[in-house]
Amino acid sequence: MDTNTFNNLISQTWPDLHAASTLGGGTFGTVYACTKTDAVTSVTQKEAVKVVRVDFTPEDRANADEEGIPFADYYRAVKEKHLQEIRWMVALKSPHIVHINGYTAIEEPDHSALYILIRMDCLTALDQLRPAHLNDTPEQAAALAEKVALDICDALRVCHQNGVLHRDIKPANILCSDTGDFYLGDFGISKGTAQQASMTSSGTLEYAPREVMTGQYDHRADLYSLGLVLYALVNHWRGPFLPAYPVPITPGDRNQAQYARMNGTPLPPPDNCTTAL
């Protein structure tokens, strides 16, 4: 979706916002940087809006027919599922969980698609900080890892106390403010712990523990994934078993590294870590 189309879409709900650029995108939607201008002070502020497009295929209609469900009811159930996931995030009260400023769902009249719009603070993903920190000293890398650990562990504490697993902890889902604070975001695939949906089909296997292969995992999966993120921060932004920086990484290297980790090979010490850490 281009910026002009996006502007037309959100003007129905948030006429004070103007989409300025695309911040990033992936499987679960596109994030747009937006601006709003205070009518009294004329001060311009930044916000972000994530747009998730949910497409409905002929197979969806066939599945609804097989189950004896009117497609309109099926469509509304999918809509409610997405909105409930956002409500979970809104209900999680932590200074280190991305704050939701508003959300809505916009339906296509023919039920061919559904747009979920989430309005939030404009932040920078941790993986976008890589160029500025790739050549950090061990002391600088340790300081960054410690700050990320403290902030995101606080966010996970609140999640797990409320029975919510994030299930996709990775640098792209850890966000940084201009003041250097970190926030946990992108709960688009979070589930209540009782639901235990497949992590391998939703999360990022690069940061997942071995237990996801059997589906036998709990809140500790989030902690493990965060641990791998922290490992990379003190290993020149590379995961375990990959070639040492600055040697180029091939797809084969990544496959071998993942195989070693999933088979329980002890992790080598990170190469940019202080002795104290």
Language model segments and positions:
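Short beta-strand micro-motifs within the conserved protein kinase catalytic domain, predominantly
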Residues: 99-113
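Catalytic-loop of the protein kinase fold
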Residues: 160-176
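Conserved catalytic-loop aspartate of Hanks-type protein kinases
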Residues: 222
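Conserved activation segment of eukaryotic-like protein kinases, specifically the C-terminal portion
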Residues: 198-212
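Conserved short submotifs of the Hanks-type protein kinase catalytic core
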Residues: 111-126
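Activation segment signature within eukaryotic-like protein kinase domains
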Residues: 148-149
